[in-house]
Amino acid sequence: MKYGAIAGGEKSTVQTAFEILKNGGNAFDAAVGAVFTSMVSEFNLTGPGGGGAFLAGPVNADPILYDFFVDTPPSQPGKELDFFSILVDFGPSKQEFHIGQGSVAIPGNTAGLLTVHNRLGQLPLKAVLEPAMEAARSGVILNEAQAYLVKILEPILTHSKAGCDLFKPKGHLLNQGDRFQNPAFADLLEMLAAEGAGYFYEGEGAGLILKTIGQKGLMTRECLAQYRVIERQPLKSKFGGKTIYTNPAPSIGGTLITFALQLIEQSKSDEKPDLIKLLKVMEITSAARRETCHDIQNEQQIPRVLEPETLNHYLDLLNTDSTHIKNENDPPSRGATTHVSILDKQGNAASVTTTNGEGCGYMIQELGIMLNNMLGEEDLNPMGFHLWPRQQRLPTMMAPTIVTGQNGVELVLGSGGSNRLRSAILQVIM
């Protein structure tokens, strides 16, 4: 390959990665630049005010997982919050979402992406962010998928006047083929290139964030300034002679993918799993999640599903002809998430998943961004809203993954889709 291999969720996103690789950047430069461009071209799926996970596989070095998912703010029981539900119409069905100032968790995307660039990138940050600046100023043409998201998320995107100005610039909602421009976001990127993440978490940008959150939100200046990216050792397992690296706890997704692969790997059958067995593995994995990881606010509980005693219990279920698994669905969630995978010509691998939820409904006009609504996501708060026992990372299904063989990296992958992403990644690996 001349420059590398790239997979992303939108044409402009992928083009940014290509240009950065072409101009001498590595996979980490390209991934960081591509994600910032996706905040324009895939505005409804990700943003600086969301959270994510970046699995980096530097050539000739062990992979490392950069966890920059969102944190819960300090609990303030009894506080009056701007927190309310809306219905999003998907056509055949409607789904309830919770938004408002009280739905905003402490964002991690900006800190995380800039940390990865600082640790592993080789081009200047300004050069990495330039394509995203250009996309924001010149605009991107909305494709069918993004136009659909704008349509169904209209109640959230246009909840504030600033949102109306951005998505109804001529008085009507942007549609497929229209140009989406966000020059204020380009200005934010200029400030990040000049001042780094401090602008967003402690400087003038932080002031604008806190002003938007107001007194009916939970974020404070202190918790925003104290946000930290966590470098974790990836969850490592063997499957089919390959080595699988993925997102460890408090990610539920990476843990459950590893669990499912181990069920298949340790199954008594020597035959390649058929669709019936694969379905059974997925059902058992969902059951294990409910029975073993039921308190996802307890980070120590999540890895227990991989303990030998637990794994053997579910392996016995898999190896029987019939199963007594209670068939319950996972919490409903369509997911508003996107992913970028890159392998450069040197052999560096980058797998990064990011999200902004559905957005909290309030645009920060000066920055051109909408913060997340993670405190209003039912699948992230299964015990109820605003009930976390302490300030902590929220759990996530995100599972950026790298598969290696004897000759190095063989597969770089990940997915959006919330509860659906683990089954998608599992099937691709198999």
Residues covered by each model-derived region:
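Internal maturation/activation junctions in enzymes
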Residues: K268-T355
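M16/insulysin-pitrilysin zinc metalloprotease superfamily fold
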Residues: G254-S269, V403-L411, G417-M430
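Noncatalytic scaffold domains of N-terminal-nucleophile
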Residues: M1-E19, G25-G196, F200-K242, P248, ...
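Extreme N-terminus nucleophile/cap motif
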Residues: A7, T16, G203, A260, ...
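Glycine-rich phosphate/pyrophosphate-binding beta-alpha loops
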Residues: Y245-G254, T337-S341, S351-M363, G414-R422
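Active-site rim segments in enzyme catalytic domains, especially the processed small/beta chain
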Residues: V40-Y66, G217-T220, N348-L411, N419, ...
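A short, polar/proline- and glycine-enriched secondary-structure boundary/capping micro-motif
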Residues: P74-E80, T255-F259, C360-E366, R420-L426
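Generic beta-strand/beta-sheet core signal
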Residues: G33, G240, N247, T258, ...
